């Protein structure tokens, strides 16, 4: 294992950002506190301070897009890659949502490659990610160990700001399209089935263990499912070898022409009306 350069939480990336900025002479955004521990381990002076992180959208050539709105109040990350080397997980159209520093909708993580069934690489399947699943068919086919028979494939169609809102469109070609609208206090997700012969669509929104289930609302109704021992769905792994019971919001629909599944993700518990049009 790599020796940690700070005692921060595993998912706290400030030490890495500090170390990278100090090592490569890049200004550290002034709204990111520098990690004194990282600098001490690396024996480097503190980097210069730069402009604060601003709202906006960025996308990567490997098939991902990230957006930030509301002065950091809301941030999302969308995965929609086409692979040139072996995939790690089946996660096309996976969406992660944070409100400030709080995770609400999250990725399941890894947990373990080698544990006894059902935990041997169990969190790699599409069924435990929140990309839409059509007709119970995984968007990729795994073989034994790290072998793949069919690689998952998706793409970012567009990622741009529309005024103060960010809009990311991603799709599994000829299967499903996901449109993510990021506002200052909520995220609206519209999933549209493209496959002409599909008959059923399912989405499972895994919640962070600390997230309020009422933060995720699906137009037309959904059900909340608690994690159960022996079943991978509903579990969250913050780091390798660790797992915690959580819950997921599940929606299943019979596919009809022009059907869309609309989900609203909030940074607060709400019993108000559903804002399906991003009002």
Model segments located where?
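CBM-like, beta-strand-rich accessory domains located in the C-terminal region of large
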Residues: 7-33, 38-41, 115-279
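Short, surface-exposed beta-strand-loop junctions and turns on beta-sheet-rich folds
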Residues: 82-85, 111-113, 195-197
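Catalytic Cys-His active-site segments of thiol-dependent hydrolases/isopeptidases
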Residues: 105-110
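Carbohydrate-active enzyme catalytic cores, enriched for enzymes
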Residues: 1-104, 159-163
């Amino acid at each position: 294992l790599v020796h940690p350069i700070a005692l921060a939480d595993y998912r706290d990336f400030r030490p890495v950002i500090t170390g990278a900025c100090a090592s490569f002479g890049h200004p550290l955004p002034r709204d990111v506190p520098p990690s004194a521990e990282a600098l001490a381990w690396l024996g480097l002076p503190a980097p210069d301070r730069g402009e604060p992180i601003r709202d906006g959208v960025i996308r990567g050539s490997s098939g991902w897009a990230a957006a930030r709105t509301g002065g950091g109040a809301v941030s999302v990350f969308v995965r929609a890659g086409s692979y040139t080397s072996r995939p790690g997980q089946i996660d096309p159209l996976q969406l992660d949502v944070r409100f400030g520093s709080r995770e609400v909708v999250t990725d399941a993580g890894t947990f373990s490659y080698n544990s006894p069934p059902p935990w041997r690489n169990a969190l790699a399947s599409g069924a435990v990610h929140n990309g839409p699943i059509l007709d119970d068919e995984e968007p990729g086919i795994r073989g034994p160990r790290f072998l793949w028979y069919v690689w998952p494939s998706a793409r970012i169609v567009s990622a741009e700001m529309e005024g103060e809102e960010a809009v990311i469109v991603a799709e599994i070609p000829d299967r499903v399209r996901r449109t993510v609208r990021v506002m200052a206090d909520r995220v609206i997700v519209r999933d549209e089935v493209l496959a002409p012969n599909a008959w059923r669509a399912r989405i499972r929104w895994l919640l962070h263990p600390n997230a309020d289930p009422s933060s995720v609302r699906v137009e037309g109704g959904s059900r909340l499912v608690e994690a159960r021992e022996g079943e991978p769905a509903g579990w969250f792994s913050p780091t390798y070898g660790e797992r915690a019971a959580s819950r997921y919001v599940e929606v299943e629909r019979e596919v009809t022409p022009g059907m869309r599944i609309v989900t609203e993700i909030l940074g607060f518990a709400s019993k108000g009306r559903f804002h399906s049009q991003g009002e």
